[in-house]
A protein has these predicted regions:
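C-terminal structured "cap/appendage" subdomains that terminate the fold
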Residues: 116-165
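An acidic, gly/pro-interrupted, aromatic-rich
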Residues: 1-137
Length: 166
């Protein structure tokens, strides 16, 4: 799962053997689950225990603005064609300005708050954020940029929250 998403001169001709990861859009349910996992804050669905993942929802009777915005089908038929794979303005605005993602990142019981309580050194904080969000360690150049962002932020917590959001 940690394959590079860019083809190289060595592997570009071996496309059918999956030598690199082909980037594709996540469906609504796995996307919300990924956000929950990376931020450390699960979504609460009505009448279900905390920690129930979006992918585990038994039917379409669990309204959720995020899932609806990102194309979760109503399941009126068994056809996968109900799912809307296209990006739209509502998704872009929700990602940029929506309160769900930012609230999960800034949650006092979330991953950033827990890392701050552990008083880890800045490099470890950046590495943890990268592993939680993009499943890899940052490159030396990325680490340098991240350290600069945190240093220029009003507070370290806000800097780390900005890194996770980005």
């Amino acid at each position: 799962y940690q394959l590079d998403s860019f083809p190289t001169q060595q592997n570009v001709r071996a496309g059918r053997f999956y030598p690199y990861y082909r980037v594709k859009r996540l469906a609504a349910e796995p996307l919300l689950d990924a956000i929950d996992t990376s931020t450390g804050r699960p979504t609460k669905f009505k009448n279900l225990p905390l920690g129930t993942r979006a992918i585990e929802l038994p039917d379409a009777e669990y309204p959720n603005y995020f899932l609806n915005t990102f194309g979760k089908p109503r399941r009126a038929s068994v056809c996968e064609c109900e799912r809307t794979p296209d990006e739209n303005l509502a998704q872009a605005l929700h990602t940029l300005n929506g309160d769900i993602v930012s609230a999960k990142i800034a949650d006092p019981a979330g991953r950033i708050a827990e890392l701050m309580k552990a008083e880890k050194p800045p490099l470890e904080m950046i590495q943890e954020i990268y592993l939680a969000t993009v499943c890899r360690l940052p490159s030396a150049e990325e680490t340098e940029v991240c350290q600069q962002i945190v240093a220029e932020s009003p507070s370290p917590k806000e800097g780390y929250e900005d890194l996770m959001w980005a």
